[in-house]
Structures are given as structure tokens and as C-alpha cells.
């Protein structure tokens, strides 16, 4: 992976969270894990203070994006966004929100202009950004807004990935009651189409196999435990199959995620947030990767939050970020192959 022509653009994330910690730790493990070249978009001073606090010997180099790959072997390249991040680890401060936002904006600009191969995002704290006037529901929605063309915002799809399992929740950050209300055949189909397209183009799976989970216990048990699986999920499966997609379902969710079952599909399409995230976080808590499908560029992220309680302590585990960097490089290579 280290022979990639273009580096990955890594965002700063919430400066008071563990983003700086794991960025530094990942660079130190670059040879051990064969990491692709990456550069961090943000404030070199923030990283320098973090490295000193953690007692890490990480040489930093402020460079232009086009020079980052060459600098990566001996230094952690930092591309300035012009925003200073002064937050203290573990003490989020709205004054650093512009630095987090600018990092995301510059990363998207770099990948869309061809300076970077993909975007990898460190965790943000939405509550902190809201204090600074951020009006998007979350990271993914902001990325979709930045990706719009001709006024059209793409439909982003969240996939959680590890080597043993890939899952996609059709409904995401809403209550269970609202998830049931929002779930429609059209939404399931449009989500699955995006999954199939990106699995083909970005992960090199020629004929993706989808397993669609039922909403209700036992996938509704022929209507005895609810009508949604017969009325909403099954028609979506039928439409996908008519389009040539290898899709099965609705399947009882409680038997979809054991080892033998996982070998029968490439991605599980789940109906709500916890149905998707509980199995993957059980299987790969430290190595899960959040992938946003449906965007005109590749975006991955570690599957965890800002972890303010351990920021600056040296306890943050970089495994999920390392996995996110490696998956982004894999997807970029597949797309250019």
C-alpha cells in the first residue's frame, strides 16, 4: 500500500478528543501495519502539544498536499487549513470548532481536486460544533452537502465494515419508533442499489450478495408478529432480484450473524441502527470502520467517538483508525484499477 501515488487526507476531528492521539499513534505504526501515506489537515501546533503530552517522538512537517507522500516515510505530514486549534485534551471548547470544520472542508476539496486519494475522518463532537453554528445533523450529512453537484445532494449510506462482516442500516440516527415510520420499500431499494454499486466499484466484488434482515422478530413469522416484513421488506427484495441483484430476505435477524451465516453474503442490509451495529461491534469492537457509500469520493472513519475521558492519556487505541486508513487505500486502489 505504501506505493500509492496519492496520499490519504486525514482530518483533525475534534481537537480535544482522541483524534490527534490516534493520528500520532497510527503514524508510529506505519511500517508495522504497512500503512499508505497520509497527511493530517489541521494545526501542527495542536499535534505538537499532543505529542509532547503523550511523550511521543513524532517529527512533524508542514507541507503542501502534493508533497505529503514523499514526506510520509520520515515525518507526519501536516497540511495547514489556516485555523488554530487551542483546545485542551478532554476539555472540548467551541472556539476550536472552526478548526474541525475547516479540516473536513479542506479534505473534501483535496480529494475532489485530485490531490488526495480518499478522505479519512477523525471523530467530531456534534454538540461542540452546534455551539459554533454548525447546522448539519452529523458528519455524514455535512460531507454529502460538500459533495453536491448542480444543487443535488447525494444520498449517503453508512456501512460498517470489518474483515468478517459488513452491515448497512437503512435508517440511522432516529428513535426506533421513527425508524419504523421512516422505513419504506423505496428507501430499502435505493439504499441497496448504492451498496451494490459501491461494493462493485470500490471493493471489487463483481456480484455482491445482499442479506436483508427482517424488521420484526423471526422476520414477522408470516405476519403473526407484524406486517412490515411482508408489506415493506419483501417487496424490496423482489424489486432488487428483478434488477439482477443477488438479494435474500427478509431473514430473521437473530440468525444472520453467526460465522456460518456470514459466509453466505457480502453485506447485511439492516432495518435500523442497533440491528446493524450490535453485531459488528461485538465481532470487531476495536477494528470496525465506518464507510460512507454514495458519495463521489471515498470516505472512511474509525468506528468510535471522541472519547474525551481518555484524550491525552495515552490510552487511545489507534486500531480502528489504522483499519480505516487501510480500507480507504484498498478502495482507492480498486477504483483506479
Curated annotation (Swiss-Prot):
Binds 1 divalent metal cation per subunit. Can use ions such as Zn(2+), Mg(2+) or Co(2+). Its EC number is 1.1.1.262. A divalent metal cation binds at residues 173, 218, 273. Its cofactor is Zn(2+); Mg(2+); Co(2+). Keywords: Cobalt, Cytoplasm, Magnesium, Metal-binding, NAD, NADP, Oxidoreductase, Pyridoxine biosynthesis, Zinc. InterPro entries: PdxA, PdxA_fam. GO terms for cellular component: cytoplasm. Pathway: Cofactor biosynthesis; pyridoxine 5'-phosphate biosynthesis; pyridoxine 5'-phosphate from D-erythrose 4-phosphate: step 4/5. It is found in: Cytoplasm. Substrate binds at residues 139-140, 281, 290, 299. Pfam families: PdxA. It catalyses: 4-(phosphooxy)-L-threonine + NAD(+) = 3-amino-2-oxopropyl phosphate + CO2 + NADH. One of its GO terms (biological process) is pyridoxal phosphate biosynthetic process. GO terms for molecular function: 4-hydroxythreonine-4-phosphate dehydrogenase activity; cobalt ion binding; magnesium ion binding; NAD binding; zinc ion binding. HAMAP family: PdxA. Catalyzes the NAD(P)-dependent oxidation of 4-(phosphooxy)-L-threonine (HTP) into 2-amino-3-oxo-4-(phosphooxy)butyric acid which spontaneously decarboxylates to form 3-amino-2-oxopropyl phosphate (AHAP). Belongs to the PdxA family. Homodimer. The active site is located at the dimer interface. NCBIfam families: pdxA, PRK05312.1. This is 4-hydroxythreonine-4-phosphate dehydrogenase. It comes from Rhodopseudomonas palustris (strain TIE-1).
Amino acid at each position: 500500500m505504501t506505493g500509492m501515488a496519492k496520499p490519504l487526507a486525514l482530518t483533525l476531528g475534534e481537537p480535544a478528543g482522541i483524534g490527534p492521539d490516534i493520528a500520532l499513534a497510527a503514524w508510529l505504526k506505519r511500517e508495522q501495519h504497512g500503512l499508505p501515506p497520509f497527511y493530517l489537515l489541521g494545526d501542527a501546533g495542536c499535534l505538537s502539544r499532543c505529542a509532547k503530552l503523550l511523550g511521543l517522538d513524532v517529527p512533524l512537517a508542514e507541507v503542501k498536499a502534493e508533497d505529503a507522500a514523499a514526506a510520509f516515510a520520515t515525518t507526519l505530514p501536516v497540511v495547514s487549513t489556516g485555523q488554530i486549534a487551542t483546545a485542551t485534551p478532554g476539555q472540548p471548547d467551541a472556539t476550536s470548532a472552526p478548526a474541525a470544520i475547516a479540516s473536513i472542508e479542506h479534505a473534501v476539496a483535496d480529494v475532489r481536486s485530485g490531490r488526495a486519494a480518499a478522505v479519512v475522518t477523525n471523530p467530531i463532537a456534534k454538540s461542540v460544533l452546534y455551539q459554533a453554528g454548525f447546522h448539519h445533523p452529523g458528519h455524514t450529512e455535512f460531507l454529502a452537502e460538500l459533495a453536491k453537484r448542480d444543487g443535488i445532494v447525494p444520498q449517503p449510506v453508512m456501512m460498517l465494515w470489518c474483515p468478517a462482516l459488513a452491515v448497512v442500516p437503512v435508517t440511522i440516527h432516529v428513535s426506533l419508533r421513527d425508524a419504523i415510520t421512516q422505513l419504506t420499500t423505496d428507501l430499502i431499494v435505493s439504499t441497496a442499489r448504492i451498496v451494490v454499486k459501491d461494493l462493485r466499484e470500490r471493493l471489487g466484488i463483481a456480484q455482491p450478495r445482499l442479506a436483508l434482515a427482517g424488521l420484526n422478530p423471526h422476520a414477522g413469522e408470516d405476519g403473526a408478529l407484524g406486517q412490515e416484513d411482508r408489506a415493506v421488506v419483501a417487496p424490496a427484495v423482489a424489486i432488487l432480484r428483478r434488477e439482477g441483484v443477488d438479494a435474500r430476505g427478509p431473514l430473521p435477524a437473530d440468525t444472520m450473524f453467526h460465522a456460518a451465516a456470514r459466509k453466505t453474503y457480502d453485506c447485511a442490509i439492516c432495518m435500523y441502527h442497533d440491528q446493524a451495529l450490535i453485531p459488528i461491534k461485538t465481532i470487531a469492537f476495536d477494528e470496525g470502520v465506518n464507510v460512507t457509500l454514495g458519495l463521489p469520493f471515498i470516505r472512511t472513519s474509525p468506528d468510535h467517538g471522541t472519547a474525551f475521558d481518555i484524550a491525552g492519556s495515552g490510552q487511545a487505541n489507534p486500531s480502528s483508525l489504522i483499519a480505516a486508513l487501510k480500507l480507504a487505500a484498498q478502495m482507492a486502489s480498486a477504483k483506479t484499477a
